[in-house]
Amino acid sequence: MNTDDKFFKQTVQILNNNNINFWLCHGTLLGIIRENRLLPWDHDIDFGIWSDEHSKEEILNFFSNNIEFKQTIVPEEMDNLNFFAGDKRIDINFYNRNNKIAYIKWIAPGNILSRFHYFMIYFIYSEISFKTTIESSNPLAKIIKILILLFLLPIKFILSHKFKNKLHNKLQQKINYTGYSYPIELMTFKYIDFLGESVPIPIESEKSLEITYGKEWKIPKQDYTWHKEAKNLLSQP
């Protein structure tokens, strides 16, 4: 069993053992439905849960006892948690819902200034350790983070809580978000067997995949860029 499959199974077991309602989504769902595997070129393994059923703190507690899952910083306003595990990132996506759609928002990559603002906010404001902050599978990204941290460390400890709040609010306005949305009627699930685990997926998985990846979702594309090519992007609802 390769490391991707191993951490997939471990994540499923952690969620199941703690009675978390979840489903497989995004590129993970795509790989399983199209190829019956986790896509080797995909950089993360995606799980969806409902934000009105479980909090980030609750999920963090469940993963904190496993030293192989290393948490990364995620802005509070983003609807997910990230853990590095092996060569991939485990993404726990907290979907919001109303009577029409299910939706999620993330920071929009590609805007370097926006990403820098986000990194500044959550290093200054977070209690997460230095080691976790610089965690990255990309050596260059890790070096860049270390250089930024050397600049930010004095700010973190010198600034008052009140000033940090003001800085947080000001920088937060400069961050751009987008995300996926699905008709709420597609968010019903069935169980399949994958890697020896019983896992939930949307009953109409193919329709869900077409909504995100388009009618050619069955054709592999290794250079897919979600924030430019997804068909169901939204601004903040």
Annotate the PLM regions:
Residues 30, 55, 98-100:
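Surface-exposed, flexible loop/turn segments at secondary-structure boundaries
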Residues 31, 48-50, 200:
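General alpha-helical segment detector with a strong preference for membrane-spanning helices
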Residues 1-12, 16, 63-114, 118-123, ...:
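Conserved catalytic core of two-metal-ion nucleotidyltransferases
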Residues 36-58, 196:
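Catalytic metal-binding acidic patch
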Residues 23, 41, 216-217, 226:
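Tryptophan-centered motif/residue detector
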Residues 23, 47, 227-231:
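Long, positively charged, glycine-interspersed low-complexity recognition regions
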Residues 12-45:
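Active-site nucleotide-donor binding segment shared across nucleotidyl transfer reactions
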